[in-house]
């Protein structure tokens, strides 16, 4: 059965046809509408889906935000603008005329990465470090989404009670410090205004402040992983995202994790599917892998 998988992100919309063997074909991408209005997103999704829908039998969506009863929500409502409470599933069912499933993008990515692991791994956690910090948890072979879709939002656990205010309203969230956005917000002097990509370049050149910001991010993620190990007793943690997959970052996280007491150590690995993980995970779920 061919699935039309859609990935809805903050900057781009992606779609592809995925068969039962997880082969991807006919990929399409469009920019996410800057206006963040329901009409703009609806029209963009229609343009994205229309050339592909005739060859699909179902639709699977991996989206930023929280998916609750088919509607789009967020811990930080400002991130969605006018899209708060957008009827995502209903909209795609109308556009495509096909049964539709929707799940958070990090949860979907976790499910894809879980399927890439050896069969004896039943408990794993996926962490994406990018513009924000997100995650997904698989426990005893089942993806945890939670009653309200909140499960796995690890970036909104506490890192520093005296840290910066997070967009979700809490003080000192992991995301507010360790994410690409958090790193950029903390940059000062000649690094002020630099994005995370530039900070990594400058760190590679030996810039002390840039090196500190990258190191601080890695340490915060390592401490969060120790907390996750204590909470889930997971067998492994898979790291993805543009920051998480940046050169040398995973090695720094691993080094900081090794400084924690031994019971909190856990195997770390880089994401296999990278930017396709959300599409593949959503397709897997739609093709019959239950939550």
UniProtKB/Swiss-Prot annotation:
It is an enzyme of class 2 (transferase). Signal peptide: none annotated. One of its GO terms (biological process) is N-acetylneuraminate catabolic process. Its EC number is 2.7.1.60. Gene3D superfamilies: 3.30.420.40. It catalyses: an N-acyl-D-mannosamine + ATP = an N-acyl-D-mannosamine 6-phosphate + ADP + H(+). Catalyzes the phosphorylation of N-acetylmannosamine (ManNAc) to ManNAc-6-P. Pfam families: ROK (PF00480). Pathway: Amino-sugar metabolism; N-acetylneuraminate degradation; D-fructose 6-phosphate from N-acetylneuraminate: step 2/5. The keyword Cell wall biogenesis/degradation does not apply. This is N-acetylmannosamine kinase. GO terms for molecular function: ATP binding; N-acylmannosamine kinase activity; zinc ion binding. Keywords: ATP-binding, Carbohydrate metabolism, Kinase, Metal-binding, Nucleotide-binding, Transferase, Zinc. ATP binds at residues 5-12, 132-139. InterPro entries: ATPase_NBD, ManNAc_kinase_bac, ROK, ROK_cs. Zn(2+) binds at residues 156, 166, 168, 173. Homodimer. The keyword tRNA-binding does not apply.
